[in-house]
Each structure stands twice: as C-alpha cells, then as structure tokens.
Amino acid sequence: MLNINEIKKIIPHRYPMLLIDRVTEMEIEEKQFVRGYKNVSANEAFFQGHYPEEPIMPGVLQVEALAQTGTVAILSMERFKGKTPLFAGINKVRFKGKVVPGDKLDLYCEIIKIKGPIGIGKGIASVDGKTVCEAEILFALQ
C-alpha cells in the first residue's frame, strides 16, 4: 500500500530511526489503524552494541516502531497533516519474545482515542504470528 518513500512523505523519521519499511493496510476514516512491517536486518546500527554476540532488537525500539506505525495513521488524517508527533507516555508495555536479525517485525497500531491534540494508540508487534511486544502509546501533536 505505502512503500518507504511514501512513508517518508508522511512521517518525519529518517535513518537510522525510521523503523517501518512498508504499510500493508490502513484505515483512517472509521476504525483508525495502520498495519505494516519492519524487515530487521543484521546491518541495523543498534545490533553493534545490543548485543554483538547475540543481537536482539532493543524493546524500546520495538515500541518506537509501533509509535511510528500509529504516526502514519495520525498524520494521514487531514486535520493533523504537517504536525509534529511527540511521545506523551507509554502504558501497559509487555515484551513477550525476542526480535533478532532476519525477522520480519509485523506492526499494528490502532488509534483508540483522540481528544484535541492528544491521543492514545494500541500497538502490537509480532514475529511469525506471535506477539513480541504490545503497548498503549500516548501521543501529542504540535
């Protein structure tokens, strides 16, 4: 649905912090959600130090990938185009598995509430159909 170049037209993130490669499904009218993925490569900069002998994607970057997925949904809405997304909080974070080089990290974020410039998204990241991370992400738009 959206390739990396189209994603970069919507969200401000860039390498090495752009953590969504493709959007495969998006709904912003009724049920506001985005589904996409990140192909996790052995060449990711964070694997140099986390951990060199047994590389694992840091959990905080899994949450960031979910937040970016939600950001695609939010900034695709006409009223929020051109705004800057900011973290306002993270709740109910759970890590349930490892993400390692070669994994396809499937990302889903549904916007469950928006009031003014503040909102909440529910994100789920999975590998091979198994949830590895879930979080409730609070955001603010400037």
UniProtKB/Swiss-Prot annotation:
UniProt-listed GO biological process terms: fatty acid biosynthetic process; lipid A biosynthetic process
EC number: 4.2.1.59
Keywords on record: Cytoplasm, Lipid A biosynthesis, Lipid biosynthesis, Lipid metabolism, Lyase
The keyword Transcription is annotated on this UniProt entry: no
Residue ranges crossing the lipid bilayer per the database entry: none
Top-level enzyme category: lyase
InterPro entries in the record: FabA_FabZ (IPR013114), FabZ (IPR010084), HotDog_dom_sf (IPR029069)
GO cellular component terms, A-Z: cytoplasm; membrane
Active site: H50
Primary subcellular site in the record, as a coarse category: cytoplasm
Localization in the cell: Cytoplasm
Catalytic activity field: a (3R)-hydroxyacyl-[ACP] = a (2E)-enoyl-[ACP] + H2O
Gene Ontology molecular-function annotations: (3R)-hydroxyacyl-[acyl-carrier-protein] dehydratase activity
Function statement: Involved in unsaturated fatty acids biosynthesis. Catalyzes the dehydration of short chain beta-hydroxyacyl-ACPs and long chain saturated and unsaturated beta-hydroxyacyl-ACPs.
NCBIfam families assigned: fabZ, PRK00006.1
Entry's family note: Belongs to the thioester dehydratase family. FabZ subfamily.
UniProt-recorded name of the protein: 3-hydroxyacyl-[acyl-carrier-protein] dehydratase FabZ
Protein source organism: Clostridium beijerinckii (strain ATCC 51743 / NCIMB 8052)
The encoding gene: fabZ
